[in-house]
Amino acid sequence: MKTKEMRDMTNAELDQRLAELKGELFNLRFQLATGQLENPLRIRNVRKDIARAKTIIRENELKQARA
């Protein structure tokens, strides 16, 4: 998911997306441990998506605090 698309989401949607990404990361790590993971690069991409979501959530919090 692109950063621009994430910025258009509400905080509730971002929280939901963050929970989905954390669950996906858990499953990917489990697959890696059992040797079933086909694309190890997916772990890195999911971690970066989690960081993007957290960053945007924090930006929104700071924006609301200033207002």
From Swiss-Prot:
GO terms for biological process: translation. One of its GO terms (molecular function) is structural constituent of ribosome. InterPro entries: Ribosomal_protein_uL29, Ribosomal_uL29, Ribosomal_uL29_CS, Ribosomal_uL29_sf. Keywords: Ribonucleoprotein, Ribosomal protein. It holds the Pfam family Ribosomal_L29. One of its GO terms (cellular component) is cytosolic large ribosomal subunit. The keyword ATP-binding does not apply. The keyword tRNA-binding does not apply. PANTHER family: 60S RIBOSOMAL PROTEIN L35/50S RIBOSOMAL PROTEIN L29 (PTHR10916), LARGE RIBOSOMAL SUBUNIT PROTEIN UL29C (PTHR10916:SF0). Belongs to the universal ribosomal protein uL29 family. This is Large ribosomal subunit protein uL29. It comes from Alkaliphilus oremlandii (strain OhILAs). The lineage of its organism: Bacteria, Bacillati, Bacillota, Clostridia, Peptostreptococcales.
